[in-house]
């Protein structure tokens, strides 16, 4: 693979995460305007965004098999066509059914693109470099999550219709589409070059189960925590502005942590540092949940920084459980994480209703403790060390 080709594929991976980050995180900014547009209460409008999450979940799950049937370049180019249709549907339709369909299509496109982006990084880089590259790729999710809400705020403040926010997000996919030209993608399944060597049936091992449970519990814990921090902070007498600042500080610290750990991870065994970070995150979340408002700002900054590398390291370790990176395995771990996203309000909503926001935060804390236990148990069964040794010879 030429260096320029590798750079193009790496940028496609970066932008695939930016696309998903923009679509998921911008929801809160535009929901009120979309509710007004359809003359609906915000509470019932929020349910239609489940179509976006469902599209992401289904496409990540199915793409484990689709990757071996449909070439990656074809998928990305077809995704561009779907993106244009979805944004056009948002712009020219006043039907709630068509809006929900367009949201589902956006979810499908983003899920397919993100799973391809993740697979490309696991295919092109090995060992500890894979972990640091995946972490840097994941930082584009947070970066888009900071940039696009600002773009949305600017457009909405200037009385520009909400659907132009999605047109701006579509420009990210235009860049991905342009990068596919003159770019060679790894061939998979029936398109892969034929070899005389017998195909080994891949055995995943129990380590994949531990990592999948950790991925689900981590995302469910993280989103369950950050979704209810504002309500919890307001209950302690903080202003809405200060409560919002806590969330902003978390994501800012999270992004800085990703950049820092993309360098730091190269010097450590991934399973050991993952166990340490998961333990630290559980402790820091407990400090936040039981501390005074005066200490909240510092504990949430520390939590954002030290938890930033956990999810990506889980995916990296998953990809290292087999000799050759398996798209099915990587997508399985990603799917478990996405299920965590889908379950966020299903799990935390009733808890808040019965016991208040702090109960939801303590539940999230318990989920982080489960992540620590899974990472610790992984140390006894993980195959990443033997596969790293094989690839380094």
From Swiss-Prot:
Coiled coil: none annotated. The gene is tsgA. One of its GO terms (molecular function) is transmembrane transporter activity. NCBIfam families: PRK03699.1. Belongs to the major facilitator superfamily. TsgA family. PANTHER family: L-FUCOSE-PROTON SYMPORTER, PROTEIN TSGA. The chain crosses the membrane at residues 11-31, 51-71, 78-98, 101-121, 140-160, 162-182, 206-226, 245-265, 273-293, 297-317, 332-352, 361-381. Its main location: membrane. It comes from Shigella boydii serotype 18 (strain CDC 3083-94 / BS512). HAMAP family: MFS_TsgA. Pfam families: MFS_1. One of its GO terms (cellular component) is plasma membrane. It is found in: Cell inner membrane. Keywords: Cell inner membrane, Cell membrane, Membrane, Transmembrane, Transmembrane helix. This is Protein TsgA. The keyword DNA damage does not apply. The keyword DNA-binding does not apply. It is a multi-pass membrane protein. InterPro entries: MFS (IPR011701), MFS_dom (IPR020846), MFS_trans_sf (IPR036259), MFS_TsgA (IPR023528), MFS_TsgA-like (IPR050375).
């Amino acid at each position: 693979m030429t260096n320029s080709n590798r750079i193009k594929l790496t940028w496609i991976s970066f932008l695939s995460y930016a696309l998903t980050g923009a679509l998921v995180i911008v929801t809160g900014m535009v929901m009120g305007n979309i509710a007004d547009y359809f003359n609906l209460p915000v509470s019932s409008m929020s349910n239609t965004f489940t179509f976006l999450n469902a599209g992401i979940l289904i496409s990540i799950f199915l793409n484990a098999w689709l990757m071996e049937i449909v070439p990656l370049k074809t998928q990305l180019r077809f995704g561009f066509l779907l993106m244009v249709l979805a944004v056009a549907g948002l712009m020219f339709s006043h039907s709630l059914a068509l809006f929900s369909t367009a949201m589902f299509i956006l979810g499908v496109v983003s899920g397919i693109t993100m799973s391809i982006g993740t697979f490309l990084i696991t295919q092109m880089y090995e060992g500890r470099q894979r972990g640091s590259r995946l972490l840097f790729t994941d930082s584009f999710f947070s970066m888009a999550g900071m940039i696009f809400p600002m773009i949305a705020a600017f457009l909405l403040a200037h009385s520009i219709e909400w659907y132009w926010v999605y047109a701006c997000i579509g420009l990210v996919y235009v860049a991905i589409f342009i990068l596919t030209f003159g770019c060679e993608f790894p061939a998979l399944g029936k398109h892969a070059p034929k070899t005389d060597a017998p195909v080994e049936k891949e055995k995943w091992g129990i380590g994949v189960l531990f990592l999948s449970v950790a991925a689900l519990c981590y995302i469910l814990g993280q989103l369950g925590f950050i979704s209810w921090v504002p309500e919890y902070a307001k209950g302690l007498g903080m202003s809405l502005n200060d409560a919002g600042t806590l969330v902003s500080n978390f994501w800012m610290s999270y992004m800085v942590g990703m950049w820092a750990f993309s360098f730091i991870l190269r010097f450590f065994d991934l399973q050991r540092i993952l166990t340490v970070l998961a333990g630290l995150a559980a402790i820091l979340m407990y400090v936040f949940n039981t501390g005074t408002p005066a200490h909240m700002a510092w504990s949430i900054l520390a939590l954002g920084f030290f938890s930033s590398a956990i999810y990506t390291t889980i995916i990296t370790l998953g990809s290292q459980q087999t000799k050759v990176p398996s798209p099915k395995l990587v997508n399985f771990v990603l799917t478990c994480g996405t299920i965590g996203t889908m379950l966020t309000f299903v799990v935390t909503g009733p808890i808040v209703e019965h016991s208040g926001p702090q109960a939801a935060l303590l539940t999230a804390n318990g989920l982080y403790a489960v992540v620590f236990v899974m990472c610790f148990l992984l140390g006894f069964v993980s195959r990443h060390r033997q596969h790293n040794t094989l690839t380094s010879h």
